[in-house]
């Protein structure tokens, strides 16, 4: 997922700057992942049921991880814990010498109260928290910081590709480059609203009969609902030859890159969204984005400048028609979109903000700080 993509580049960059940085991963069984998927949905506002057996599996998995990672975590000056999966680790390190920070990548603006109440028991003991947007931040008894995610322009998913590779992608997935293409890249998750995307496509196709839709996503090992959603998407697609539903392997970065470059318009019609790295990825490739009016999409998609935010399939269909019928506007929006990402959402900015945070955490109580 997006968090892993960021860390794959962020950790080596920190190491290149001389920091002794490492990235540790916890492992759990299917019950653990059912529980953490429930946490994820609950933080985003779903009314979820979490049986005691799920919570027990969650706490036991974190205990086992604490035993495995104990030496590493105790010796760290700064520990950043990402999202709910390992949030309970902190309870096993009472009196820790380093600074512990909980980093929430999820839209926590309107969480399901019982889920947040349970997680808050762990989160409130951290030294600080990071959220992606001010709207996501929760009231906590420690400093809360805002750091937006980012993309790496040198990642395989974002580098320039040769024309031959892009044309091979058209061929591989039987897409006609002479006809308009709309694309959504996301895991198969109800919050990403793939069924709403299909509805939007069908409405727009009444006016643009040549329109093609690509829904591309991968399997997330920590998302037990993905297969059911994929089945629903395939059923909704029916036998329409102009809808391509692609289940891609986790390392299909160049394929996703090529698909984004193939598309005329990229959609991210999420109902809830933490940030939406696929939005920044598409904008970096000069594609206007039609996105759900939610979460981090709002700070990336600026109406009439980098794309449009919408609240319904009808709204998305209207914007698809508008852009495809006004190619000059589509091109200008794409140019603005890339410039906006360059200024705001590249990993160099993200790294700078992390380094600033580390400095504040380690030296913020000093009245005078001498550099050098």
Regions found by a protein language model. Name each.
Residues 8-76, 138, 147-154:
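A conserved catalytic-core segment of Leloir-type glycosyltransferases
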Residues 171-192, 198, 213-214:
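Conserved donor-binding/catalytic core segment of Leloir-type glycosyltransferases
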Residues 217-258:
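Nucleotide-activated donor-binding/catalytic signature segment of Leloir-type glycosyltransferases, i.e.
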Residues 257, 280-284, 298-299, 305:
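Short alpha-helical segment that forms part of, or immediately flanks, the ligand-binding pocket
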Residues 271:
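Aromatic "clamp/platform" in nucleotide-sugar-dependent glycosyltransferases that forms part
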Residues 288-291, 301, 309:
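Short hydrophobic beta-strand element within catalytic cores of glycosyltransferases
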Residues 303-314, 322-327:
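Conserved acidic donor-binding segment of nucleotide-sugar-dependent glycosyltransferases
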Residues 322, 329-343, 350-356, 360:
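A short, well-ordered alpha-helix in the C-terminal region of glycosyltransferases
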